[in-house]
Each structure stands twice: as C-alpha cells, then as structure tokens.
C-alpha cells in the first residue's frame, strides 16, 4: 500500500492515455512525491492518487471516466494494485490562493504528462479539515519531518472558502491546528494565537 514515484508515473501515464489530457492537479497523500525528498514512510501509505484534469472542457465527466476505468473497483486496480481516484476542484479544501504556490511535476516514467502539485501546507489544511485517521498520520509524519508547519497552516486557514468549512466550528479548527503543532513534540500553541470564544 506504499506509493512511490514509479507508481505515481504509471498512474499519471494511464490517466493521460485514458482521458487525452496531459495536465492534472495532484492532491491528497501522494502529492508529497511531487514536492519532497527524504519523505517519511507514513506520508506514503496510500495506493491511490487523487487527480483532476483542470484543462478539460468537462472536468467532472473526465473525473467520472477515470473513476470508472482506473478507479478503486476497476480491472486496472485489480491488476496493478494501485488506482486513480478521480476528484474535482472542490475535493481538497484549500486556500483560494493555492494556485500561486504550485510546482509542476514531470516524472521520467510519464513523458509529456504534467502534475500540478499544491504546496504541502495547503494540502495539510485539507487533511486537517478532513481529519480522518490516515490524515492525522500523514500530518504527524509531515510535521515531525519539518515538511509542513502548523503556523503556516494557521495563517492560511482563513483563506479557505467559507462554504467549505462552515460545518466545522472555529474552535474545532483551532483545536486541530493545536494538535498538529503538538505532533512536533512541542507544547501546542496554535490555539492560543487568538481567544476561542
């Protein structure tokens, strides 16, 4: 269930072949492969990549097609053990200005295919909002490795569109940010930046 760049490249190549698209936005756990070196194993515990095709005329139609032919329950996944999770631009709840901090990943195993990779702190915000067990594991590993920073997350959280966070009380967001800070082994401090009412 561990992702690596060879698997990432194979999945991107398959997605490009299936969709006719050459550019994808890569979010989720596997995005760390497009940004980091010496990546902790706990950040790579996934067998999927989360992508969408930003240049497609109908992004959702491409997403649905990728899900059907390369997704979790597809023959492709059964044969390869890895799969494409087709997502949409709203799947990852990130700050509105995240596109200004992206890099492009061009793997040697997927020539001609580009993955647009958000900053890891923007992806970390999305994971902090989802807060599943696998997200907390990823956040803990990234924080301890110095790849993500709770203070940066705190500065950016208010730039996430309000409709994407309205179901999570502000005090709960602050509590989660505080817990991310504690993953470093230091006392939590993010929740004390402002008074929780």
Labelled PLM ranges:
Residues 1-197:
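Compositionally biased terminal segments of proteins
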């Amino acid at each position: 269930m561990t992702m690596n760049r060879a698997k990432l490249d194979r999945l991107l190549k398959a997605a490009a072949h299936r969709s006719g698209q050459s550019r994808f936005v890569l979010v989720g756990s596997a995005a760390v492969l497009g940004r980091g070196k010496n990546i902790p194993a706990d950040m790579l515990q996934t067998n999927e990549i989360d992508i969408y095709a930003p240049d497609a005329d109908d992004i959702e139609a491409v997403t649905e097609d990728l899900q059907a032919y390369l997704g979790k329950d597809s023959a492709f996944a059964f044969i390869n053990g890895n799969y494409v999770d087709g997502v949409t631009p709203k799947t990852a709840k990130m700050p509105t200005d995240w596109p200004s901090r992206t890099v492009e990943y061009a793997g040697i195993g997927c020539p001609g295919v580009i993955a647009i990779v958000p900053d890891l702190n923007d992806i970390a915000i999305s994971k902090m909002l989802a807060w599943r067990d696998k997200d907390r594991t990823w956040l803990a590993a990234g924080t301890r490795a110095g790849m993500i920073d709770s203070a940066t997350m705190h500065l950016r959280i208010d730039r996430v569109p309000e409709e994407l966070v309205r179901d999570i009380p502000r005090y709960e967001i602050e509590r989660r940010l505080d817990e991310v800070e504690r993953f470093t082994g230091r006392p939590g401090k993010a929740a004390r930046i402002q008074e929780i009412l």
